[in-house]
Regions:
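Hydrophobic small-molecule pocket/channel-lining residues, especially in calycin-type beta-barrels
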Residues: 21-177
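Bacterial N-terminal signal peptides that target proteins for export
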Residues: 1-7
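General secretory precursor processing signal
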Residues: 7, 11, 171-172
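Hydrophobic h-region of N-terminal signal peptides that target proteins for export
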Residues: 11-18
């Protein structure tokens, strides 16, 4: 049994080792748009702001650029029981987000290309593991870039095909220095 496992491990590791050593792999250019470039600039750790707008110790969001610059990965409420992930990518001309919710669904939202200059406004564009006419889910979100160190996030959740009053509270975040 141990020999079989060793053979399987070697067979699985060979392609990974070969890929890791080949520095000549040609990648196509990464699709982009202005809103996606804005999202990339938000990479870092974001903490809750106190009532005066000053940073606290409460980490609320960790944003990083990944996958060769083709995706932005956001972890919301890291380490908490309600931790969630949102992935931002470019699909054709559009910035899109898939939100992996603590509710077990994955709403997809598309950024409105006509959003104000300091905002990215996302609207529901489908999803997995949800029926938008019945199930509770995130339905829209607005990210406001106040300045390089301050952002605000407001969302609207839906339940039963209508806005829900108990979801997606607003957040005021400060970039951790």
């Amino acid at each position: 049994m141990t020999r079989r496992m060793l053979v399987c491990a070697v067979l699985l590791a060979l392609p990974l080792a070969a890929y890791g050593e080949d520095k000549t792999i040609k990648r196509p250019p990464v699709a982009t748009n202005p809103a996606f470039e804005t999202m990339k600039k938000l990479a870092g750790t974001w903490v809750a702001a106190d009532e005066g707008g000053k940073p606290t110790d409460q980490v609320m969001s960790i944003i990083k650029v990944t996958s060769g610059g083709s995706a932005v990965h956001e972890t919301l409420f890291p380490g908490q029981p309600h931790e969630m992930v949102s992935i931002y990518t470019v699909d054709g001309p559009d910035l899109v987000m898939t939100h992996f919710c603590v509710l077990g669904n994955q709403p997809r939202l598309k950024a409105d290309s006509q959003s104000p200059a300091n905002q990215i406004c996302f609207q529901f564009a489908g999803g997995s593991n949800l029926d938008p006419t019945k199930d509770k889910h995130m339905h829209s979100a607005t990210l406001t870039i106040v300045d390089d160190s301050h952002i605000e996030v407001a969302g609207v959740g839906w339940d039963g095909g209508a806005p829900a009053k108990d979801m997606c509270c607003g957040l005021k975040l400060v970039r951790k220095q």
